Structure formats: C-alpha cells, structure tokens
Amino acid sequence: MNVVETKPWSSLAYQDVLRPPGGMRTGWAFLTTYSAELRGIAAALLALAGSERENSGGTAMQLASAVQQLRGRVHVAVQSGRLAPPNVRQKMAVLLDSFVYQVERDERQSSWHPKIALIRFDPLDYANPDSHWRFWIGSRNLTGSENLELGAVLEQTSGGGVEIEGLANSVTWLAAKAGLIPRHFKNEIHELAAVRWLVPDDWKEVAIRLHGHSSNVKLPKVPDGVNELVVVSPFLDKTTLSELSNWTGNDKRNLVSMRPRNRLRQSRRHSNRSRRKPSQPRVA
C-alpha cells in the first residue's frame, strides 16, 4: 500500500469546471451533492454565469444577476437535511433555495451521495446552433471544506471521442429522484445520448453506473490486460477490496485511503450514528 503524504497533486478549481467557455453561456446544468452550503451554491452560480475567477467571491449585484440569468436552467440536488443553515441574507437565501432540490433518503438505510456536474453550454451567437457539453464527476460537495478531493472533467468533442455508457440513463434516474419533471429536461437527455466525449489517451472504456438503487449493480467487468490498479476511497470494505485485488494478480496495486487508524475511527462513528434512533421530544 502506498501512502500519499503532503506532495500536492495537480489541481483545477471546481468553479473553473463550471465556468462557460468563451462565447458561450450556461444553457442547462444539473449538479448533485451530498451536502451543501448556500455560499457554495452561490459560488457555483457565479461560475456558471461566467464570473471571472478573480471575482469569484461575487458582489450582491453579480449574484442577483446570476440568479436571474440561471433561474430555471440550473438544478442542484442535495441530500435532505444536509443543506447547512443559511449564512447569507434571508432574501438571498430564498432566491438561492429556488435552485435546490432536497432528496428524501433515510440515512439509516442509504443516502443521496452522487457528486456530478453536467452542463450544456449554448452559444451567445444565436446564429451558431452548436452547444457544448461538459461532465464532471468526483468527490467534492458544494461546501467550503478544504478536503483533498478527486474528480475528472470530460468535454464534448466533434471528432472521434467515446460514448459514456450509462450516462444518459443515470442522469435521467438521478434527476427523477431529485424531483425534476422529466418533460422539463427531455430535450437535454435526448441530445446527451448522442454526445461523444474527449477522454485521456489511456482511457479505453468509460461507463457510469449507479450503486445503491439496484441490488444487481456490481463492479465493472475486469478489463483485458490490466497491469496496474489504483483504488481511491476514504472508507473500505473487505469484500470489494478482495474482488478488486483479483483484477491484477501479482501486478502493481495502489490503495489511496485514510490511515487505517483514522479510517476505522470514522467508520465506527458513522456506524454508531447510523444506528442511533431519532431523539424523541420530552414531555414535561
């Protein structure tokens, strides 16, 4: 097992992922997160509205403009009960809340845990009919935490590229669970199914699978010729690790995780919290 200490990885600010390319604007976006803060949602809206990086903090006027520009275009799905209490003005909190869909899941059984950003950018020049799609998937929540996060950004390409198996179906399922009315985004899903994606040279297959909503969802099939495996996860279970270890035989395997002592402590805390019954009001 290789332990990652303090050497920084190359990074890309999450807001830069959301910001439209030159000559384009955000036409539609679907963001999912486990937890969120309204300031994090505000920062995302400013980026989606094209706010420059050096002004990413935004002024009240910039935020009001972003809200007006993106209303009905941007949808943020968060686990119910995991939206932090507002730390912005009440009027602005109401405006930001209009972008949020709280997904009801009993966390004693399961939670809403996907973190994705799927964005369609439309040209500012209406004579140009070509939109551009961008897809991010990773571990970051819409909060101000400074945890070490990992994500991948894929861009639409007009030549070559690959299909992302399961993406359109997964987004449809997630959006429906979040409460979006299917007819309000059917055009986007229809268009998404035909998109080809530019991926890193070493990526041979890309597929999106939803875990937790179906008992028959399993790990992907073992690709041919695997000679190295990297597993990144803060929490682990013996069964999954055992299955993944068979992918490479005696070849190189890398596990990026928390230190075992901390991981065990966190797992126990999560387990105890999951078993804890909701408190009952006391009767005087």
What is each model feature region?
Residues 1-284:
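PLD/PLD-like phosphodiesterase catalytic module centered on the HKD motif
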